[in-house]
């Protein structure tokens, strides 16, 4: 393990300009130095990240570098700015926020990332995939590690000052290979860093720069042995064969990439109506509860995915139908793209359970309801005696009834359906009444729903 400086605490004694010259003095930059011109220099990315771990010598030319890491060992990532300080005036803020992630390099595993990480969580309860070593880190503020995102950490830092984050990766590459029999090749990961600046509201949401590199993680000291093995293999090759491979660099430069597609989707919902006076009560019409009939096997909801749905509409549909974990996976899919996918495609991408559920949701295969009932919201000014309504002497503005299809004969399911129908919170509904033959109101309970279903059948 080679570092440029033995004491990270001394970084603040040097300015960022001299530190950047150290980075540009690496062999990888020396090869490109003759080609640099003022125009090319202006196109340099605003930031640069350097992982202080040696690259493998067994990587062919024109292939991406590969870096071996030891499980649980702290590795330094240096956060650098490439431009002059004057170029950072457009940031309108002193700090930027960086998010470091460890993700899969294999596209096949990217499709099932959620299931893979959940399986790892169950096999390693209480552990994290990625941690930040705060005591060793320099120049970072407000480091955070979400308990729900085991493979990501985030923090703030000042591009005008020296900053280094020390990370620890706790999962090894062979934990995600098919069933292990010994001697398998571990799957490669990626270390990706996404940096954001503040928007006009002070939120770190405006993307500034992203870069990543390929890694493999071994058990403690395994990375050192693998690096030595690769070096010995290269020494046995002829000079002509060695020309086909990259030299091993003491540090790993993260290369620019697209930002990680982590998008927060907000579902538009109708505003909750304001109510005055007594708590809300909803009436179930007299004799308007009926068992399921073939003619009444209507769709449970009208929220079907249409071929004309845009990419944004498809993302919101996934979110509304409890497929939020696949929003990033289908980030570029329109409604037509999703509708064209077969059951086998979705099972392979999402796993058996979620794949079948997503296929049924896309194709509009709904569960046949156990009961169909009709409800109305009876407003205070429209409440008149039942006899007056029958005689025609009451208010002509009668309640409008809506059909509700119940998959479960429980009060909770009924309240949730009513709340969804009227675009209010279920907590706003205190009781639900069923209006009897003589106009009496009976509080609806689970027992009453079950008995009504039995007697109606």
From Swiss-Prot:
One MF annotation (Gene Ontology) recorded for this entry: DNA-binding transcription activator activity, RNA polymerase II-specific
A GO CC term attached to the entry: nucleus
Keywords linked to the UniProt accession: DNA-binding, Nucleus, Transcription, Transcription regulation
CDD domains (alphabetical): SAM_LBP9 (cd09590)
Annotated InterPro entries: CP2 (IPR007604), SAM/pointed_sf (IPR013761), SAM_3 (IPR041418), TF_CP2-like (IPR040167), TFCP2L1_SAM (IPR037598)
Subunit field text: Forms homohexamers via its SAM-like domain. Interacts with MTA1; which is indispensable for TFCP2L1-mediated self-renewal-promoting effect and endoderm-inhibiting action.
Entry protein name: Transcription factor CP2-like protein 1
Keyword DNA-binding: yes
Region (SAM2-like domain): 261-365
Annotated source species: Pongo abelii
Family under the similarity heading: Belongs to the grh/CP2 family. CP2 subfamily.
Compositional bias segments (type: Basic and acidic residues): 221-245
């Amino acid at each position: 393990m080679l570092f440029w400086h033995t004491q990270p605490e001394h970084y603040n004694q040097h300015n960022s300009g001299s530190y950047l010259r150290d980075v540009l003095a690496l062999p990888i930059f020396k090869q490109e130095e003759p080609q640099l011109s003022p125009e090319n220099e202006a196109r340099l990315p605003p930031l640069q990240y350097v992982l202080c771990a040696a690259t493998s010598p067994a990587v062919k030319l024109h292939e991406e570098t590969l870096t071996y890491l030891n499980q649980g060992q702290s590795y330094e990532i240096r956060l650098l700015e490439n431009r002059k300080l004057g170029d950072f005036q457009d940031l309108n803020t002193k700090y930027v926020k960086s998010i470091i992630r460890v993700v899969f390099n294999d596209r096949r595993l990217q499709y099932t990332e959620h299931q893979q990480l959940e399986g790892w969580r169950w096999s390693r309860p209480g552990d994290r995939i990625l941690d930040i070593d705060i005591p060793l880190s320099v120049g970072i503020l407000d480091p955070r590690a979400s308990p729900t995102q085991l493979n990501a950490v985030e923090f703030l830092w000042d591009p005008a000052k020296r900053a280094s984050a020390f990370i620890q990766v706790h999962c090894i590459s062979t934990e995600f290979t098919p069933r292990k029999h010994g001697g398998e090749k571990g799957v490669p990961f990626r270390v990706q860093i996404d940096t954001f600046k503040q928007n006009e509201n002070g939120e770190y949401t405006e993307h500034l720069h992203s870069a990543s590199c390929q890694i493999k993680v071994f058990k403690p000291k395994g990375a050192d042995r693998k690096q030595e093995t690769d070096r010995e293999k290269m020494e046995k090759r002829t000079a002509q064969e060695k020309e086909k491979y990259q030299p091993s660099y003491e540090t790993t430069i993260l290369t620019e990439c697209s930002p990680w597609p982590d998008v927060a989707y907000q579902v538009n919902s109708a505003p909750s109506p304001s109510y005055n006076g007594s708590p809300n009560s909803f009436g179930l019409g007299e004799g308007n509860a009926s068992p399921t009939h073939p003619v009444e096997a209507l769709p449970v909801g009208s929220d079907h995915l249409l071929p004309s749905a845009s990419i944004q509409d498809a993302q919101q549909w996934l979110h509304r139908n409890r497929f939020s974990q696949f929003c990033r996976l289908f980030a570029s899919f329109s409604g037509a793209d999703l509708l064209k996918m077969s059951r086998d495609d979705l099972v392979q991408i999402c796993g058996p359970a979620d794949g079948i559920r997503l296929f049924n949701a896309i194709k509009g295969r709904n569960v046949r309801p156990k009961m169909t009932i009709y409800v109305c919201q009876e407003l205070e000014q429209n409440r008149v005696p039942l006899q007056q309504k029958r005689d025609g002497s009451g208010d002509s503005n009668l309640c409008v009834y809506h059909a509700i299809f119940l998959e479960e004969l429980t009060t909770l399911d009924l309240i949730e359906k009513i709340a969804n129908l009227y675009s209010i919170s279920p907590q706003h509904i205190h009781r639900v009444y069923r209006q009897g033959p003589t106009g009496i109101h009976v509080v609806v309970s689970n027992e009453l729903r079950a008995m009504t279903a039995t007697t109606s059948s």
